[in-house]
Design a protein with these regions (language model features):
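Long, charge-dense low-complexity segments
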Residues: 1-221
């Protein structure tokens, strides 16, 4: 090793010794260990609303939305979707059953209700919901009431359920009326029949479901 290289190595070693000495004075003989910087305080996430609160909130707008109406005449005349929204599989099902549906075939009605399940979104608001094709022009639905919602929001709950059920079923099949019954503990607490004509051209955002139910002859028991 040349003299110049030796001097460089000694200078480097001397520098490291001095740095260790400084560290020893500052940290009491030991070098500090690396620690991750503490994470910045994050704002606490707002508490999620309880299930009951969510149901109460959505109950006030339950009737304002509904399924898109199935155009069975369109489905009969076309092999593929014309609306740009319906899936090929679903359209194929509609196309297959369109002729019998338009003829008022109750077996076709029943199969469509089972496959399409138009009331599937409402299961969290009731203990059970059934639907039945009574005739070519009439569907019937019965739901077993959610006890808590019935107790807290009786008329609003019943009317909201009734109107949403009617809207979804009228959108699903070309019937003229839907009869809805609400039961609790084996007793009928609500009964109403909505006709297509009564619901036609309504702005449901501004509709009072209780007033409409009474207009349609509803019985709150």
């Amino acid at each position: 090793m040349s003299e110049e290289q030796q001097n460089y190595t000694m200078d480097q070693n001397e520098f490291l010794k001095r740095m260790k000495a400084i560290a020893s004075d500052l940290w009491g003989g030991t070098l500090p260990t690396e620690e991750a910087a503490p994470a910045a305080d994050r704002p606490k996430e707002p508490a999620k609303p309880r299930t009951d609160d969510r149901k109460k909130t959505s109950l006030t707008s339950l009737w304002k939305t509904a399924d898109e109406t199935i155009d069975w005449t369109d489905a009969l005349g076309h092999d593929t979707p014309t609306d740009g929204l319906t899936s090929l599989k679903k359209w194929a099902f509609y196309h297959k059953h369109a002729k019998k549906v338009l003829e008022g075939d109750l077996a076709a009605y029943t199969e469509v209700l089972q496959k399409a399940n138009p009331l599937g979104e409402l299961t969290e608001y009731a203990e059970n919901i059934t639907m039945q094709a009574h005739s070519a022009d009439r569907l019937e639905s019965t739901f077993i009431c959610n006890a808590e919602l019935l107790e807290q929001h009786k008329e609003l709950y019943l009317a909201a359920m009734g109107l949403r059920i009617a809207r979804d079923l009228l959108a699903c099949l070309p019937v003229e009326e839907v009869a809805v019954t609400g039961n609790r503990e084996g007793k009928e607490v609500f009964a109403v029949t909505y006709t297509r004509q009564q619901l036609l051209h309504r702005n449901f955002v501004f509709t009072d479901p209780v007033a409409l139910a009474k207009e349609c002859g509803a019985e709150f028991k």
